[in-house]
């Protein structure tokens, strides 16, 4: 089970090992006014424990590539650097203290003006992840690869101009297929680099699916994202190990 049924607090729980309420994050991080209304902090304090920092202290190279959403973005400009949480290097999205310019051409989660288009974002993250692994293959490493393409809007390449369909099952399926392809490419790279027999890969999610498709995406469990029923907090968990 995840520690919360929505993104930001769940990610904080995974990062720190604490209950989200302990770190002052109880729903998705938004602008300052919304955060205040929800009685939560504007960002995860870097004074909290961090899984990456523990690995870093043990001599691991550490990297974060993908969505952050634990502080930064919108009108929150004082969130700590991702490096403060124990990451040697990072690439992140709009909802972070230092978003990657290639995927944040405007002041929003994504834009048609981004040089890396929405439908190429996971490919971009995997390219950067493979590069990270290649550079650190001769030492222990810890990598967060947190793609965000399964979060709405789902923008497959063939539907890029049809914004009326970005929340439909028709759009969801090819986006899911593309993510599956890219994760497979990353696993293959580990094989080709001779790292599969010395690397643990954990595949999971931050929360249940958005309420859609007659709840079928939650495997017919009661509840979905934003719900404390099983459909909101019971996650896929796959672990590949030597």
Language-model features: where?
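Formylglycine-dependent sulfatase
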Residues: 1-242
